Amino acid sequence: MDENNGLLLLELNPPNPWDLQPRSPEELAFGEVQITYLTHACMDLKLGDKRMVFDPWLIGPAFARGWWLLHEPPSDWLERLCQADLIYISHLHSDHLSYPTLKKLAGRRPDIPIYVGNTERPVFWNLNQSGVQLTNINVVPFGIWQQVDKNLRFMILMDGVHPEMDTCIIVEYKGHKILNIVDCTRPNGGRLPMKVALMMSDFAGGASGFPMTFSGGKFTEEWKAQFIKTERKKLLNYKARLVKNLQPRIYCPFAGYFVESHPSDKYIKETNTKNDPNELNNLIKKNSDVITWTPRPGATLDLGRMLKDRTDSKGIIEPPEGTKIYKDSWDFEPYLEILNAALGDEIFLHSSWIKEYFTWAGFKDYNLVVRMIETDEDFNPFPGGYDYLVDFLDLSFPKERPQREHPYEEIHSRVDVIRHVVKNGLLWDELYIGFQTRLQRDPDIYHHLFWNHFQIKLPLTPPNWKSFLMCCEQNGPVILQFSTERTNEPNRNKFSVENKA
């Protein structure tokens, strides 16, 4: 209120946090700042006498068993990680937070400093469950410079669309800024530093089960193909506009180099087309004079050289002739064995695990009925597997769909993955982004509250299965797993083969 008891409106226009304590760029010596691409979203930065690594995913799958590395990492990747002075991990998705990779690193350097943003869902929420022994994880506030030495500092910023989990980073060395927006949909709400020395971002698309894993209604192969084509083009145009607006000296498309290489995901691999980084680079060059760099594993960009003379032949050093660029084999078995270990777990001998799990999950008071069906590799019902309904309005488990009007979804999940997720209390991104489900829904509506809960808001500790099994022992003999037979599908809200509006 003002002095006349009137309402006083103030428009807040705070300064950009990276403009606080500004530092003028100093000339860089050749070789002083070098950025080496390892694979996917992993970069190895030499910054004077310090080394910093982004998002190390170098071995194993991401999202259960759905994503595998497209590029062959340099053979010295583990040495590079061990020599790092600090590591930045942008968010909790397993193509950025790779526990198989970190397990290798922790075996050599458990105390390596790792920095993450102070997100609502902690990046390392599942560290204890993972069994990885890391002892120097640092959670830092957003928008505040973190000083590494007199020449090097960094600042972590949140995403404007997914602030609960996504972050990006500004690294500054002797006044030269490197902006890595990673997977952020709207990094820092759209406010970002302009004319940085180097900017890098994702570009590929395809990091979702939609629409490839959907069927029924409008989800014909023709509709999916057109949707994917349109969405990929929209993403390319958005990235090109962002680069044009921010005017970095150099732009690098990365964080999109994955492939659905397991034979069981052949359909996804063929359907889920991704953007070509060179197409994005050509689009950028049409509208600006920004230098673009499409990296190959082991390629190194010398920032000092490139800023001084963009035509310098030594500005970008490609890997030696004959270096293997693309992976042609993946070690599937050790990771599939981990998933398969959940199949015969004692938990699933008791049908009451269903109520135990969904009560633990804590999602209810929402008018949605979901049918969960365990399947084999090819999404056919798994022999002896579970097939059940969950009514989230009152969190009940009826044998038939309720008579009231209700949205309905069917989620077919590969049995090894869904049981691994249930047993360990993991987020459903393992299923959805990992292409481990097939879905139908009626009506064709995205239930944000449901999916957001299971993808980001599940409890931070897994279900107490030890206590559950003790109760089962006290309450009587084992109830063998069952399959709910539904030979006559209910007519209510039955899926139509016609397209839905």
UniProtKB/Swiss-Prot annotation:
GO MF annotations, alphabetized: CMP-N-acetylneuraminate monooxygenase activity
Primary subcellular site in the record, as a coarse category: cytoplasm
Tissues showing expression: Widely expressed. Highly expressed in thymus. Not expressed in brain. May be expressed in adult stem cells (at protein level).
Cited SUPFAM superfamilies: Metallo-hydrolase/oxidoreductase (SSF56281)
Keywords recorded for this protein, A-Z: Cytoplasm
GO cellular component: cytoplasm; cytoskeleton; membrane; nucleus
Keyword Transmembrane: no
InterPro entries according to UniProt: Cnh, RibonucZ/Hydroxyglut_hydro
Leader sequence segment: none
UniProt subcellular location: Cytoplasm
Example GO biological process: regulation of Wnt signaling pathway
Family of this protein: Belongs to the CMP-Neu5Ac hydroxylase family.
Function text: Sialic acids are components of carbohydrate chains of glycoconjugates and are involved in cell-cell recognition and cell-pathogen interactions. That protein has no CMP-N-acetylneuraminate monooxygenase activity and is not able to convert CMP-N-acetylneuraminic acid (CMP-Neu5Ac) into its hydroxylated derivative CMP-N-glycolylneuraminic acid (CMP-Neu5Gc), a sialic acid abundantly expressed at the surface of many cells in vertebrates. However, it may play a role in Wnt signaling.
PANTHER family in the record: CYTIDINE MONOPHOSPHATE-N-ACETYLNEURAMINIC ACID HYDROXYLASE (PTHR46522), INACTIVE CYTIDINE MONOPHOSPHATE-N-ACETYLNEURAMINIC ACID HYDROXYLASE (PTHR46522:SF1)
Name the UniProt record assigns to this protein: Inactive cytidine monophosphate-N-acetylneuraminic acid hydroxylase
Gene: CMAHP
